[in-house]
Each structure stands twice: as structure tokens, then as C-alpha cells.
Amino acid sequence: MDLLLGVLSSGILQNALPFVAGVGRVKRPKRVKLEEAFREAHLCRPVIPYRAPTPYTGGRVKALFVGINYTGTRNKLSGCVNDVRQMLGTLQRIQFPISECCILVDDMRFPNFTALPTRENIIKHMAWLVHDVRPGDVLFFHYSGHGTETKAERDSEELYDQCLVPLDYQVQGAILDDDLFELLVKGLPAGVRMTAVFDCCHSASLLDLPFAFVGNNNFYSGGRHEMRKVRANNFSMGDVVVFSGCDDSGTSADVSNVSSFGSGLVASGGAATQALTWALVNTSQLSYADIFIRTREILRQKGYKQVPQLSSSKPVDLYKPFSLFGPITVNTSLIHYVPQQYLQPWGPPQPYYPPPQPQQPYYPPPQPQQPYYPSSQLPTQYNNLAPTAGIPLMTSSSEVPPGQYPQALSGDQNGGVPPQYPSDQSTYYSSAQYLSGVGKPL
């Protein structure tokens, strides 16, 4: 026993095995004030994280990244900020042409840091992500941090609601999956594509989407698989695909050393993020099934028990090529489950992006993160930050096509155009229509 305690205290075991931390079930949080969130969406200050060689001409490409290590608290994680770093590096490497993004992490030294991932900031920036979206726009959302659950009240299809856990959750509370659906999915118009990645515990149904692949560790063993309907409602005009680190009852591992995933970065990270980014970089023309076969196989080989999940607003044909652009290719055998009004045509085909060429990783390894606040208190530095804290906007340049960004709202003097960064400065390692129907709780 003494020997075992010595090993645990030295941290050797944590470096060898996945570390899973949790916050336990939480008190049911307050509902999000959606109208207020969308009124404040224009206060967000997006940036351009890098320049892709081939710009996307079909619309805007907006992205939101949230990584929370909860540094200095009893629920501290070690790899969530690195997950954001890894995801940004992967998207850059595959030349995903982000036109504007916001980065919420609890490390102010992170390049292009936008704001701390407090409850207020996460909600406001999620509203920014979907505010004023139009057909052809492409959205990407990545969250790495704690996930938890709370007793469901009005949901007849599950006993517990899933929640995201902001930095200040102990004071301000978590964010319900009901509100995540209302914020991110419900009001998307036809022709908008969203891909979301949740690397956290209890994450399979965080957006409460109607279709899911509910699988187990035998998925890679062969046979044909398909999605199934898991909810009677919650349809959307937009096309939404969600990759989750585990099922609703499962935990998502925080890995102390991710070099075994082949990323080259000796640091911490979420197992699901590491496996998914590896699959995206090391395969081309892969299908949804390919991603899951490879991701689950990687995690299984490394000794992880978590099983990544897939959910969507429409039944995905798992054997069609995966893309971050364009409409979901619907499994025709399941299309009758989707109400006709949610199957509007998309219009012209989306442009094809060739597989990326091999590149060297750009983003420097992270520096050791120091606690910014005592474990027993709220983040003290947040109290001194203005609600609009982040990267100030700069005037537009000739490199930003006219009309690519929405018109400035009152008080926004720079046209809502993200700042332009030199190609060697920001590189990375490996709405009124929307509010229609608001006020109808699930």
C-alpha cells in the first residue's frame, strides 16, 4: 500500500494512464437569457488566426474555441488549453479557411486570446457565432473542459440534462443542453453548416440533436452501421454535426502525455481531441465511418475506455466523405424521419478543397501555465475586465473582400472586421430571424 501511494503521489501513474476528473452532478443552472445574449453578440472581438492559402468564397467561416483548465481550483485539468492549440493547428494544417474566430481560454498568454471562458462570455460568444448567419456560411465550435449533468425537469427522453462547465460555474452555474440547442442550433437557416467538437464528460447529447450513432467499442470490428433517431423533435433547418468525446454517462480522459498520439507535442491534452485531430491529418478523403473507426481504434490501443459519439440534425450517411463544408449527405433509408420543411435544397455545390500537403507544425509548444487566482475564490482578474475585453478590432485592409463581414452595429466603429495578422505571427501548432421561436422551453 505504501508503495502504491508513493507511485500515485509522484505522478508516475498519471503519466502512464488517462486521468479523468469530474465535478459531479450540479444544481440545475439558471436558464440563459437568449435575447440578452444576442443583443451583446456584436461586442465580441473576433480575430483572424491564420491565413489559409485558398479562401472560402461561399460565405463566412466563423469559429469559436473554448478551452478551460480551471487552473488553481480543485477541479483543475491539464490539457484543455492544449486541445484548443491542437485543434487550431490541425485546422491550419488542413487549410481550413477561418475568416474570423474567438478564443476563450483561461490562459491570457494564448496567442489571439479573446476573453476568459466565464459563463457570460461563453454564452455571448456562442451568440456571436450564429448571429446573422446566412446560407453558405460555415461554423466550427470546439469545447474542451468539464462536462456534467443535472436532473432533467421537462425532458421526457432522458433522466439527466447535460451541461457545459464554465470557469466560474461555482458562482454563476453551468450551461444547460436545452440552452445550447436554443443558442446554437434552433435558429440556423437552411444552407448553414456547423461542426461541433465536445471533448468533455457526459457529452454525447450536449446539443440534444435528433439523430445519433449510438455505438460501442465493437464499431471498428466490421459490418455496416447507421445512425438512428434518438429524439422526437429538435430539428433544425441548418446542417449540424457533433463529435463528442464520450457518451452521456461516460467520462473523457485528460492525458498527461500525448506524445504517443504522434503529435510531437509532449504536453497534456484531451484523448478525444488528440485522436480526432490525428485522424484528420493522417487520412484523406475519409468518411464519417473512417473517422470513428480510426479514432476509436486509437483510443482503444492506448488503453482508453471512452467511446466517441456522433450526433447530427439530419441522419448522416456514415459512408459518404466527411467534410467541414456543405450539406450533410443524408442516409436515404432514414430520410422519412425528417419533417419535409427541414429538407430544403442547398443550391449550388460547395467548392472542393484538396487534401493538405505535408507541413511542419507551426504553433510553439505552450509555456507552463501559472494559476491566475486562488483556488477558493472566483477569478479575481475577471472582476477588473470590461465586458468587451479581448483583442481590439483593427481597420479593414485590402485583403478582406468588401461585404464579407456583416455591417457594424451601433458602437462598433470598425465594421466588425477582424484584425489582419502577418502569416508568420499567428500560426499554430499541430439576429432577429434567429430569435424567432425564442421563449419556448423544451
UniProtKB/Swiss-Prot annotation:
Function recorded in the entry: Cysteine protease that cleaves specifically after arginine or lysine residues. May play a role in apoptosis.
Biased composition (Pro residues): 348-371
Signal peptide: 1-18
Sequence ranges of Low complexity compositional bias: 372-382
GO molecular function: cysteine-type endopeptidase activity; metal ion binding
Biological processes per GO annotation: proteolysis
Residue segments, region Important for catalytic activity: 19-62
Domain of life: Eukaryota
Binding positions (Ca(2+)): D161, D177, D178, D208
A Pfam short name: Peptidase_C14
Similarity remark: Belongs to the peptidase C14B family.
Keywords: Calcium, Endosome, Glycoprotein, Hydrolase, Metal-binding, Protease, Signal, Thiol protease
Active site per UniProt: H146, C201
Subcellular location: Recycling endosome
Gene Ontology cellular-component terms listed: recycling endosome
Residues glycosylated per entry: N69, N112, N234, N257, N282, N331
Record note on modification: In epimastigotes, the unprocessed enzyme appears to be the main form. Auto-processing is dispensable for catalytic activity towards small oligopeptide substrates.
Effect of H146A: Loss of catalytic activity
EC identifiers of the protein: 3.4.22.-
Regulation: Activated by Ca(2+).
Main location: other
Region (Disordered): 348-442
Species per Swiss-Prot/TrEMBL record: Trypanosoma cruzi (strain CL Brener)
PANTHER family recorded: METACASPASE-1, METACASPASE-4
Protein name: Metacaspase-5
Chain intervals for the UniProt region annotation (Negatively regulates catalytic activity): 336-442
Polar residues: compositionally biased ranges: 422-434
